């Protein structure tokens, strides 16, 4: 099914952009196979009229045209199209317009100046199979931008439908699903019956029982056979994969695409009556619209005139009663044919039509009278005429009845494993066009007549989860043989985490998950402990709430064995007591590291220095960068941390851990006589990241500005950096702290920070005035938020 995006949006008002719409369609089961964007680059292309055409003196194929584009003078354009002629209204690309990679310029062709280009639909990307100039209606307003005239830009969206979703072979059918998924509502379609003006009618007889239980029609006299298809209708058809033919045929196709009801139009002057629907007889012959004559068996459903076949019902019309260029009186047909009566018949004859594709899967039995009224109104508006009364013949006992289903709350919860709010259930069902009545145990739901796929309670539950999204269902690990899967590109596995830390010269340790309660008391972690009922020993009586106590104890044992430079890490689970009485402990996975000694191994090319906070912070940021996680650091008040040399680590507005130097009082009680730098974080936020995206390098130069400021001691560099990023936004490529000074010239309680800012725009070169304005805003923001003073 192919349709116009703008056409769909006319039926369901949604704010979602095209990408979101396409993703939504696929998510709710209407798989998008292709999206062809139309008319996104039609600047300087206008509607124009060819006033005069003369042959080119130096070429047999070229013509010299004088073209009216609503400018002061006519434009001279050389054109080689076969259908160029005076009076023709066509798209004109003015000088400076771009057609693909071609920029239209004034040029000379065989000695004759040409100041523009007359365009075909193919050149404009509107029709890949078109040839010759695109011919516009004579009444198209000259000088109007073509994009405005053709309601562009637009997109032709093609979706792949499963056999059970025949209701989505129409724009309105798709609109109901989109409305439900996007929390919108389908625009009501008011189709009033057209009052009869003509008394002409045709008798109809149904002799096929359940195969054809409803047949509707209408005779319209005195239409204008020369009336053209309006451009808005032709474009909607073209963008839906149907080439416009003639007004009457186009109207039947348009109604089919909008409502989902296949129709056929007969030249009423070729009919004698009565019209009938019956099964074919062996060896009956019929000449089809495609010019072939076929011989039928007794298994085809046929429309007859005076008991003679004139059409294959639900497949294709006949040659003798076809609409021609001279047809002025027409009989419109819209009927309900059962899928079993149409299925497989086309294959017998090598036929596959839009009508058969729909009837084989099921068409809404309530549509025929609406389709007749809609098509009649369009014909009267576009071609005039006098309509007769609606012809409506039915066999009520054979018409399919909509399913009435009890939907229970308990059944929803049992099948899905979740509870869906009553308001949400009713919203989804109403948006899908269902009648919903509240009952004590749930709802009584009547499915719309177009939804043949809804028959039982489970079908309704499927609709709820399909629209809400399967991602909201709880998941469980499958039971059975495991299979090797491709690693996720947006998530680090444990092996990658280990490799990343090992690459930073850290060594993995594995410690007991049980720990001494006395050790936790020294760390002031003796609240919320999970005690073992049957511990192995008194020293292993508590399940560890954090990794650091055991990891630092291991570091202390290494120091006691005369190792001066120790760098350890651990991955493992930690346990905390649940707030709910009797509930199992909460188990989460953490990563921790502890280092001491020299920053680098002893060597002649590097001056020896002790490891510090910033060294381990770099190791942590390297791990975060591997997954794309963004970390920020804020002042910490953890009792085991050194005041002023530790920080809480945040990710996505959540505190996930701690980093810093251990408090000297703690290391003293642990009998560790060196400074220990450590971190511990919840692992999940670190390993969950976004898929990296490549961005083109800007071809414009960057600008660096440095800022020296005096900052209160309690204000952290992280807080300043956040403020700078908030103020500058996307123009800020990087911000670095390259100097920190405390001492002479700086009053107590303050520090001097030197900040480097890199600014760059992807679309233009930043000038001094731009940069000065940005820097002024930065200075004002940090002064107001952080009581900063700028150093001169």
UniProtKB/Swiss-Prot annotation:
Domain B5 spans what residues? Answer: 400-475
Q: How is the cofactor bound?
A: Binds 2 magnesium ions per tetramer.
Write the Enzyme Commission number(s) for this entry. Answer: 6.1.1.20
Task: Give the first-level EC class, as a single word.
Answer: ligase
Give the matching CDD domains: PheRS_beta_core, tRNA_bind_bactPheRS
- The principal localisation class reads cytoplasm
Task: Give me the Gene Ontology terms describing cellular component.
Answer: phenylalanine-tRNA ligase complex
Biological processes per GO annotation: phenylalanyl-tRNA aminoacylation
GO MF annotations in UniProt: ATP binding; magnesium ion binding; phenylalanine-tRNA ligase activity; tRNA binding
**Subunit notes for this chain?**
Tetramer of two alpha and two beta subunits.
Q: Which family does it belong to?
A: Belongs to the phenylalanyl-tRNA synthetase beta subunit family. Type 1 subfamily.
HAMAP family for this protein? Phe_tRNA_synth_beta1
Name the UniProt record assigns to this protein? Phenylalanine--tRNA ligase beta subunit
Taxon lineage: Bacteria, Pseudomonadati, Pseudomonadota, Gammaproteobacteria, Lysobacterales
> By which gene is this protein encoded?
pheT
